[in-house]
């Protein structure tokens, strides 16, 4: 049994499904998330890192934040942590496989991170590239997650696995260069430091997808998953396959998050002009 349900299916529903399948499923593979960790994205993580709270019978309201809350948004992570506990309660440790992927990219992506960068590269011109080109990033290809999930369903010893690319193998620079390469190299990257972007109130993770300054966001140990057979293809292959999918008319499923990613073209140029003059005056919004 491989369960890819999102937080739209609360822990209590996962619990009910697990109970219904207990007698017929040998293993329960639950696709969770690194958001289930209390320390993400601030701290480096291993599978032993503390999870967020979330009871196995929680409903969809558990963990919702009050109006006006300006602290960490742990709702999604709490729902996923509760669902993990639901699976464990029914199937036990040896029959439960808990996959915790980070950012998943690849053909069919509906969140819009990689598609936005590809379309931005295709448009060409001067492209605002965020932060340090040498910064390690750890996206994983959706096809590699699928293969690992099926393999673990067939032969896992159970337990939790961080499903991300190895730390240090991929960088933000190599990722954006791959986007330029597959789209015909119409643009040129202009690297802008984190400090300037933060002072200019650029939204991390959304306005510039994959850009985030927190220490732990791309510092997730995946050695256990790789020892169990996880193979992560080079990120350049994911970029090329996603571009081919888009060029062949690929259309993602409709999702509310698809419109939240990307920097407005006018704001991008104002930011670049301001960076050239080393001032952030008048560039917010």
Question: What is each stretch, according to the model?
Answer:
Residues 32, 83-108:
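Conserved beta-loop-beta element that borders a ligand/cofactor-binding pocket
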Residues 118-130, 185-186, 217:
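A short C-terminal helix-loop "cap" of Rossmann-like NAD(P)-dependent dehydrogenase/epimerase domains
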Residues 151-214, 221, 243-245, 250-285:
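Mid/C-terminal beta-alpha module of Rossmann-like enzyme folds, strongest
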